[in-house]
Amino acid sequence: MITLMSENTEISTNCNHNKVGFLGLLITLGIVFGDIGTSPLYVMKAILHTGETIDESTILGALSCIIWTLTLQTTIKYVCVALRADNNGEGGILALYALLRRLKSKWVYILAIIGASTLLADGIITPAITVTTAIEGLESISPNLPVIPITLAIITIIFFVQRFGTESIGKSFGVFMLLWFLLLGMVGIISITYYPLILKAFNPYYAVILLAKSPQWFLILGAVFLCTTGAEALYSDLGHCGRKNITISWAFVKTMLILNYLGQGAWVLTHAQTASSVNPFFSIMPQSMLFFAIIMATGAAIVASQALISGTFSILSEAMNLHFWPRMRIKHPTYVKGQIYIPTINLAMYIGVVLIILLFRDSSHMEAAYGLAITITMLMTTLLLGIYLHTKGVSRFIMILFIGAYCTIEGVFLAANLSKFLAGGWCTMLIGCILFLTMYVWVCAIKIRRHYISAKPLDDYYQIISDIKADGSIPKYASNLVYINHANKEGAVDDKLLYSIINKQPKRADHYWLINMEFVDTPDTLEYDCETLIPNTLYNVTMHIGFRIEPRVSLYLRQVVEDLVASKKVDLTSAYPSLRKNGIPGDFRFIIIHRVYYPENSVNRQQNLLMNLYSLISKIGIDDPKALGLDTSMVVVERVPLIINHRINNIRRITKIAEEQPNRQL
C-alpha cells in the first residue's frame, strides 16, 4: 500500500489547530462556537414572547432550563461523549456514519441522511436570524432604521466573499470571538449585581416547577432549546480543532454564556413591565456601550454565518464521497487545508437565506422556524452514538440508558418545537424533506446501478487483450488506455469495459490501466495498490480514498505512473520511433463508461420512479469526467444502456422467408 499526495494534502497549513495551546484555543473559539455563541441574542427574547407571565418563578425556571440544557445536551452528550466518537480525528454525523457503515444496516444510513438533511436545513435559518437580530439592535438607537435592507446587504457580502476564501479575515475570528465572549460575561456580571437572587437558577428545582405548573411550558421549552442549537457544530468541527481544544474552550464559553443569560434574567426581573417589548440582550448593555455592542453582535453573527457556510460545504463534500449527494464542482479558494467552496451550494444557500429574511421579516418570526429541524438531527446523532457505543463493547445497559435518556430529553424538545410548526417550523421541515428525498433517491439509485453491473473474470481475457495489443492491423487507439472499473468483486471487470476494448471498436494500446476507486470509512486516507496483470501491458490500480478527500484521478494516476517508472516496473516511453528516440512518453486517454437508464425497459414501478428522479437530480451535479477530476481533453465517454429487469417483447414474423415461398413473384 503506497500513499498518494492529494491536492488537499499539498496545501500548506501554517499551524496545527489540534495542538493544545493558546493559539489552538483561540482558533477553536473562532471556528466552533459562532452559532452557540450568538444564541444570547435571541433566546431570552423568545422566552418572553411565549406569553407566560413575567415573574420570578418563570424567569428562574426558564434560566434553570437553559443552564441544565447546556449541561445535559452540550456538555455531557456532545463534549463528554460525542467528541470521543471520532473517525480518525474527524467528527460529525456523516463521520459517525462512516464508522458504522460496515454494519451494512439500512437503518444506519437512513438515520445518517435524516440527520444530515435536517442539519443542513436548519443551517439556512442561522445566518438569517443571527444577522437580523444583531441589526435590530440599531432600532434602540434609531427606531426608523431599515433593518431588512441592511441585513440583506450584509448577507450578500458574506456569501459573495466565499469565492475568494476567508483565510485573511479568518485568522482574526478567534480574537474577535474571545472579545465577544468576554463582553457577554462582563455585562452579565454587571447586571447580576442588581438582582443577585438570580443565581438561584442553578437549582434544577425551578426548572421542574416551571415545567410542571406553567400552561406555556411547551412554548418555553421550544425557546429554551435555541440555546443549544449550536451543539452539533462542536461535534462537526472536531477535525478542525481537536477534542482537547474544544473541551477546554467550552468551559470558558459555557461560563460566559450562563453569566449573560443570568444577567438578562436579572434585568427582566427588575424591568418586568417593559421587558417583553425589547430585546434583553441589548437592554443590559450600558448606554455608552450600546453601539459598540451592536457592532460586536453583528461581527459575531458574521462569524457564526461564516462557520455555518463552511460547515455546509464540508458536510456536502463528505456526502458526495459517501454517495449521498451528486458530485458538484468544488473549488479551493485559498491555500488553507480543507477550505473549500461549492459555487452551486453557495448560491442555493444565499437564495434560501434571502427568502427566509423576506418571508419572516423580523427575528421574532424567525425564532418560530428555528430549532425544529436541528432537534431531529440531535435525535439521529443520539441513535447513531448508541449504536457506536455498542460496537465499542459498552454494556447493553449503558447503551440503552444513554439512548433512553437522550431520546426522552430530545423527544420532549421535539414535541415542544412541533408547536412552532405552523408558525414557521414548516419552512425548515420542507427544506429538510427536499434534502432527505434527494439523498435517499441518490443512495437507492446508486445501489440499483451497482446491482445491475455485470462483472466477468478478468483473467479469462488476458490472452485476447495481449492479442489486440500485438495486432498491427488494428489502428492504435492510444499509447495508454485508462478505464474506471466499477466491478466490486476482486479479480472481476465490468463487462461493458471488456465490450469497449474488444467488441465495440477494438482498441489497441501499448498499456491498459484499470482504475478501481474504493471510498473508505476513514477521512483522510489516500493510498493505492498496483498489480501487474500482464507484464508491460495490463495494470490494475486500486485507489483507497477517504471520505473527506476529493477524487482527482488524473493527479493520482500521474503519481502512480511516476512511482512505477522510477522503480523500472513499466516503460512508458512512446512506441513511435520518432518520439521514442527523444524519450517522449506515450499519450494517455481515458474511457468513461456511462450507463444510460431507459425507463421503458423496467417492469418495476418503484425502481422506475427512483431512476427517473435520479436522472432529474443528477442534472444539478457535474458529469463523470469532471467528477473524477479528469482532463476532459483526454476523455472519451461511451454511453451504454442500463438494463433493469427489462420487458421481453417477442417480435412476430409477418412474412415468410424466400425459401418457404419459392414461387413468389418479386
Predicted regions and their residues:
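The structured alpha-helical core of multi-pass membrane proteins
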Residues: 2-666
